Amino acid sequence: MPQLPAPTDVTPARKAEILAEALPYIKRFFDKTVVIKYGGNAMTDPHLKDCFARDVVLLKLVGLNPVVVHGGGPQIETLLARVGKKGEFIQGMRVTDAETMEVVEMVLGGQVNKEIVSLINQHGGKAVGLTGKDASFIRAKKLLMQKEDAAPGDVVDVGQVGEITKIDPSLIAFLDQGDFIPVIAPIGVGEAGETYNINADVVAGKLAEILKAEKLVLLTNTPGVLDKAGKLLTGLTPHQIDDLVADGTLSGGMLPKISSALDAARNGVKSVHIIDGRVEHCLLLEILTDHGVGTMIKSK
């Protein structure tokens, strides 16, 4: 995977050149919204966590409006194991009974969210932690998931997994105007106050649509989307995605990621990228340079 040179390897002249190279991107994206789905190794490796927080703060300071949506799969699995439960997934979605929902809300809305907020704030940002239950800004209903290769209407029960029905953007707009950085745990609320676990990629994609984001960036543990031979696919169209799903190249956790990315691209998000979160400062590379680090999803 591509690596950046260590800071000590870069001369002062080169540092100045790098800053100057970023200027066109800073001008282009000034006051634009970038929705970032934060997950994978970038959330567990201490150095990568620090790089991510610094990237987000820098993006805010140069005039962009970053909005962070995070996952927390490994942390959820750790706590489930402590209480004697085993995680189960169907078509990339976590099966969520009542006990699992308690664990998910505790981990995502508490432990993980507050750690991200704290890291960003340590580097000079003004991060605010939220779940979709705050101001009921992410409304959801129970997801009825269609079984694979089954007749229409033949659904599988995945418990308290939610499908987004409405996102109210006013809370995020209010925070942006105050120079705050929203950090969102993917938990929604039902009409009767039910709590729903929503896939973080789905939340990020829908939020990018509603906010009319300039970019949606999804961090992964791979260089991007790979073909069967393990080669990076730098650009994908809907037709190519259908072929990759049909032949089994795309499966599991990559399915909701690809689906959300494609929906966002089709619904007005100008640029959608699935990038390698294991690369230091991957956000700056993707947004403020020509050095892409992943796969771009095209709407056509």
UniProtKB/Swiss-Prot annotation:
**Its Gene Ontology molecular function terms?**
acetylglutamate kinase activity; ATP binding
Give me the residues that bind substrate, please. Answer: 72-73, 94, 197
Q: Which Pfam families match?
A: AA_kinase
Keywords recorded for this protein, A-Z: Amino-acid biosynthesis, Arginine biosynthesis, ATP-binding, Cytoplasm, Kinase, Nucleotide-binding, Transferase
Grouped into one coarse class, the protein's main location is cytoplasm
Which terms under GO biological process does the entry name?
Answer: arginine biosynthetic process via ornithine; L-arginine biosynthetic process
Give the Enzyme Commission number.
2.7.2.8
Checking Gene3D superfamilies in the record gives: Acetylglutamate kinase-like (3.40.1160.10)
Cellular compartment(s): Cytoplasm
Pathway involvement of the protein, from the record: Amino-acid biosynthesis; L-arginine biosynthesis; N(2)-acetyl-L-ornithine from L-glutamate: step 2/4
Q: Where is this site: Transition state stabilizer?
A: 37, 257
Going by the record, the broad EC class of this enzyme is: transferase
Q: Which InterPro entries does the annotation name?
A: AceGlu_kinase-like_sf, AcgluKinase_fam, ArgB, Asp/Glu/Uridylate_kinase, Glu/AcGlu_kinase, NAGK-C
Keyword hit for Transferase: yes
Q: Kindly state which reaction or reactions the protein catalyses.
A: N-acetyl-L-glutamate + ATP = N-acetyl-L-glutamyl 5-phosphate + ADP
CC terms in the record's Gene Ontology section: cytoplasm
UniProt family annotation: Belongs to the acetylglutamate kinase family. ArgB subfamily.
Summary of the function given for this chain in its UniProt record = Catalyzes the ATP-dependent phosphorylation of N-acetyl-L-glutamate.
What is the protein name stated in its UniProt record?
Answer: Acetylglutamate kinase
Q: Native species of this protein?
A: Aromatoleum aromaticum (strain DSM 19018 / LMG 30748 / EbN1) (Azoarcus sp. (strain EbN1))
Protein encoded by which gene:
argB
